Amino acid sequence: MIEVKNIAKKFGDKTVLKDVNLEIKDGSVFGLVGTNGAGKSTLLRLLTGIYEADEGEIKYDGEPVFDNEKVKEGIVIVPDELYFLPNSNLKRMAKFYESYYKSFRRKRFDALVETFRFDKEKTLSKLSKGMKRQAAMILALSVRPKYLLFDETFDGLDPMVRQAFKQIIIKDVEDNNTTVIFTSHSLRELEGVCDTLAFINNDTVVFSGDIISIQNSMFKIQVAFKEEFDKDTFEGMEILGFEKNGSVANMIVKGDREEIEQKIKAMNPVLFDVVMLNLEEIFNYQVGASGYSFDMSLLEEE
């Protein structure tokens, strides 16, 4: 299990992360979602022990990760900005991985190369972005680590390759109890893969939890009453969005779904309907509620 407690990180005077707390269970597929520049990549580098936290601690099965080679042997990361040895090909990189990771499986590597029809002899620096990412993922998956971390996971991969890698990763989780962490600014990439999510905004985790709980904690309600009403009618409820057209209002509500349904039904509405939100909608409303938005009025013509 990975425990992240009260983590903070600065670069100079700039605060990148503050008061970050997470618990990632073994065998889970954990998605770390946030806008560009939210701190996802920094947190991933803290999780791998590349960076040292200014405050707080990160532990793997009770052991600190920073400056701990024993823990790091069980962690493999595919970063957003890929790095390969100068003038290397996949064949040479496999030897390098094999020399560092005791768990590197040559048979697994050969099978992945054959599956994706990857030319091991081609110089990696001359390949496209998508092919470089394929190479990095083949190497990472050949290690069969206990902890597998991906930054902007499927960026540059075509749809068929992306789906194939997803299937391989999910099978590793099922067969080997691998713990996987994905970061992305696109929830569509992670939906259907992750069982747990954390949303980062304004340098910290806004909320986290298993996907079912998250989807049940925020929803859209369509409601109407005989009498006149406005947002204040629903005092005591956390309303993230309220729009009224005529006598019908559409609201985005955060909280215990069953409890909120009971409260509104007790108000005797003439129309009442609950609509589930997808994860991308939840993320957009949550981030908007915490102050991230664009002032589109600046683009209006004078």
PLM feature segments, named:
Residues 2-4, 17, 72:
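Conserved structural motif at the start of ABC-family nucleotide-binding domains
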Residues 48:
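Helix-to-loop junction immediately C-terminal to a conserved catalytic motif
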Residues 79-135:
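ABC-family P-loop ATPase nucleotide-binding domains
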Residues 165-255:
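ABC transporter nucleotide-binding domain
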